[in-house]
Amino acid sequence: HVFFRCGTGILLLFNAEATRRPPAPDARLPVPPHGAQGPGHLCLAAGAEEITRWKAHLEANGVAVEADFLWPGGGRSIYFRDPSGNSLEFAEPKIWGL
């Protein structure tokens, strides 16, 4: 599992195989099964310069950037995959009118 602090919140990314199993009868923390099956998608807001830096960082570390484009209404997005196959995106907030 990986946890990211995002401002005042926390983003939790779970190992799907581990969270899909029901807890053992004697589990100290009986967390019920949860999560999704198949690849998911997560988008994180980032400024134009941050996206450029993230793309360089990802590529320097062997992570393939699947797409890098400008939206018709303005704003850039890059897409890549995490080790579990989930689609991750950095996008400028202006794509949502923010």
Feature map (PLM): residue ranges:
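Non-catalytic surface loops within mature trypsin-like serine protease
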Residues: T8, E17, A46-A48, D82-S84, ...
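Core segments of cupin and vicinal oxygen chelate
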Residues: H1-R20
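Residue-level signal for secondary-structure boundary sites
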Residues: L12, R21, E50-T52, L88, ...
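Vicinal oxygen chelate
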Residues: V2-R5, A24-L98
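A short, acidic/glycine-rich surface segment
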Residues: R20-L29, V65, L98
